[in-house]
Curated annotation (Swiss-Prot):
Localization annotation: Cytoplasm
Pathway: Amino-acid biosynthesis; L-arginine biosynthesis; N(2)-acetyl-L-ornithine from L-glutamate: step 3/4
Record organism: Bordetella petrii (strain ATCC BAA-461 / DSM 12804 / CCUG 43448)
Single Gene Ontology MF annotation: N-acetyl-gamma-glutamyl-phosphate reductase activity
Protein name: N-acetyl-gamma-glutamyl-phosphate reductase
Annotated catalytic residues: 156
Protein role: Catalyzes the NADPH-dependent reduction of N-acetyl-5-glutamyl phosphate to yield N-acetyl-L-glutamate 5-semialdehyde.
Recorded catalytic activity of this chain's protein: N-acetyl-L-glutamate 5-semialdehyde + phosphate + NADP(+) = N-acetyl-L-glutamyl 5-phosphate + NADPH + H(+)
Principal subcellular localisation of the protein: cytoplasm
Homology family: Belongs to the NAGSA dehydrogenase family. Type 1 subfamily.
């Protein structure tokens, strides 16, 4: 499906009933260059979207439909806010029709098919399409994203870890010990999705704080693969995710040991220079302590750099809204770049406080 730059982008969403799906609807319904044409859900076929999500009353007039009824091949781009495995099953047909794909699941995140199959317990349906897909972290892959037909939208934890560590590793930087990196990450419960699950029941998640996936989490290989691309070699990463009793928000505390020859580096200046031209990345003043509420419902990601007592340990604090910059907002940012629009189109919402 060819797209004329002076017309609105025809957008379809597969899997519009989960949290990332409704977040896509919220953002795209306000986008000045988008026409929402299809939102699919087999279970809710025929139900008006606004009946399920009353925050969209007056904004989205569509009803959910099955993928067969939705004519997705008539769209310029289709977002998949679905479980792993769905996008790759439909990718060939959509690409043949000229429709571009942005997958918010993991089908096109990991370039190594064996790694994908080991962690997601399914064969990859289209290794040829995977080979041409682009990892959609705009701040690291801007040029490739702009030319892509298929985007693997990054996971929420990887977004914070990669953007938090990139200035220390990219372009041959030899600033920190790449074998002892630590990512201590916390997420609100919306990151687990909308499915019924005991661990995210109110009585389980409220007034509670716990680690999970310590022995192995699916985002670990994704983070490692991208860090190794940045560093140009193997990295050692300890990644520990936690669930905290809030709905939205992610806070990642990253630890890196400074190499002896880099002890004189001004790391605050390094980060400020690296992200000076990035619309959504805010490097906070030295000594800052970011709070997740400062990015709630926005596409901003904030970074604070700390070096306790001027020693050899660098601590990088990173916050984002896991549903926006960590998922749907980042997907829209990718779409904007793919269609030659300003990256901030439809994404300049100010965070909500309190």
């Amino acid at each position: 499906m060819a797209h004329a730059s002076n017309s609105r982008i025809k957008v379809g969403i597969v899997g519009g009933t989960g949290y990332t799906g409704v977040e896509l609807l919220r953002l795209l319904s306000q986008h000045p260059h988008v026409e929402l044409t299809a939102i699919t859900s087999r279970k809710e076929d025929g139900l008006p979207v606004a009946d399920m999500y009353p925050n969209l009353r007056g904004r989205v007039s569509l009803a959910f439909s099955t993928p067969e009824k939705a004519n997705l091949a008539d769209c310029d781009v289709v977002f998949f806010a679905t479980p792993h495995g769905v996008a790759m099953a439909q990718a060939q047909e959509l690409l043949a029709a000229g429709t571009r794909i942005i997958d918010l699941a993991a089908d096109f995140r990991l370039q190594d098919t064996a790694t994908f199959e080991r962690w997601y317990k399914m064969p990859h349906a289209c290794p040829d399409i995977l080979a041409e897909s682009v990892y959609g972290l705009v701040e690291l892959n801007r040029e490739a994203v702009s030319k892509a037909r298929v985007i693997g939208n990054p996971g929420c934890y990887p977004t914070t870890v990669l953007l938090g560590l990139a200035p220390l590793l990219e372009n041959g930087a030899a600033l920190v010990d790449t074998q002892t990196l630590i990512a201590d990450c916390k997420s609100g419960v919306s990151g687990a999705g909308r499915k019924a699950e005991v661990s995210t029941l109110f009585s389980e998640a409220s007034d509670n704080f716990k680690a999970y996936g310590v022995a192995g989490h699916r985002h670990h290989p994704e983070i490692s693969e991208q860090l190794e691309k940045l560093a140009g070699g193997k990295v050692g990463l300890t990644f520990v995710p936690h669930l905290v009793p809030m709905i939205r928000g992610m806070f990642s505390t990253l630890y890196a040991r400074i190499r002896p020859e880099a002890l004189g580096t001004d790391f605050q200046a390094l980060y400020e220079k690296r992200y000076a031209d990035e619309h959504f990345i805010d490097v906070m003043p030295a000594g800052s302590l970011p709070e997740t509420r400062s990015v709630r419902a926005s596409n901003n990601l904030r970074i604070a750099v700390q070096r306790p007592n001027g020693g050899d340990l660098l601590i990088v604090l990173v916050i984002q809204d896991n549903l926006v910059k960590g998922a749907s907002g980042q997907a829209v940012q990718n779409m904007n770049l793919m269609f030659g629009l300003p990256e901030s189109a439809g994404l300049d919402q100010v965070a909500i406080l309190p």
